[in-house]
Amino acid sequence: MKTKHHGQMSESFLTAVFLSLSGGLQDAYTYLFRGKVFANAQTGNIVLLSANIMDGRWDKVLHYLVPLCAFALGVLAAEKMREHFQAMQRLHWRQLVVLGEVLLLFAVGFLPQSQNLLANAIVSFSCAMQVQAFRKVNGYAFASTMCIGDLRSGVEAFCIWRKSHEPHAKDRMVRYFGIIFLFALGAGCLLYTSPSPRDP
């Protein structure tokens, strides 16, 4: 039997669809068009930051350090918005997060290649707000801007389903792998609809 979840719209699978598409698109955008920096995958930025420090390439350090700091500030901003606007009646605080994200990403589109550092900082800040505000789909923990946790959870659910044929495990497996597919689709759509990537 298919599991139904009666909860907030922010935890619906439809919401996860759009957030995952957006997450993949944003990561592909900053990596391919803004100087090979990850907007979401801060682990990759930490690796590249460390590599450049060890190589003595100090001109590249800010290239990866600024998005890291912006991501941390984005998490703080989302938490502050939750604290201040959680009791609002007309709007849900997560709707304000989405509105802020849309405005920030719209502004990034007008920044020239010479402003890649600022563009990457804004996108990382926006991604952090998204990942902090939207952390569940149909009651299951998920991340719309990175895949490692979703991949682990999907494979775990597959192992449980293969062993016990538990319907809930199958449902989780399908949802997690679906989210990963949508993330990849978002990244692919950017390439399909954009000109060839250009390095600064």
What are these regions (language model features)?
Residues L104-Q113:
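C-terminal ends and interior cores of transmembrane alpha-helices
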Residues L19-S22, V66, A70-G74, A78, ...:
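Alpha-helical transmembrane segments in multi-pass membrane proteins
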